[in-house]
Amino acid sequence: MSNSNISNGFASPSEDGARAFRAIMIAMARPGKILDLDFLVPPEPLSPAAGTVLLTLCDPDTPVKLLSTVSNKEVKDWLAFQTGAVTTEAHLASFVIGSWSEFNPINQFKKGNSKYPDRSATLIVECDDLKDSGMALRGPGIETVSYLSLPEIEAFQKNNAQFPLGVDFIFCAGSKIAALPRSTKGTKD
């Protein structure tokens, strides 16, 4: 493990971690709201936002799946050193990170069960860009309608149709994040 992997965590772990956690929770509570998470520079190819999400939400009890676009020795070593999180298979992971094309079919990931719907995966999707245009979002945390540029509509509609089961999404583009909880309905307006 190189020194750059060790030094690329939060500059001020308790303060940066608290601010990052708050931003992630705001994104989940306000679907479609684009926020900035510029707290660190993780190893490539992870974006600053995705690295911040992983450092904020993962610990030694968190199973993570790194899909092929983000899985390399530097990322694995960095994640292990910074969080202690273990890598696992996709169907066992609480957090899965990669590019959109790697997530299909979405039903390969944990979606919870009727007794424990919270035992589902959060998919961290690395994107080229995030814009407040595109798919119309409605549901909890949205006063009337919110818009978010998403890679497609059908997968999100199928995911929402399973509610309270399903997966949650955090989209990352550079230092920007936006979230789409499974409770959010999406339509093409």
Regions from the PLM with identified roles:
Residues 61-62, 73-189:
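Internal, well-folded beta-alpha domain core
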Residues 1-63, 67-70, 81, 175, ...:
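N-terminal, charge-rich interaction modules
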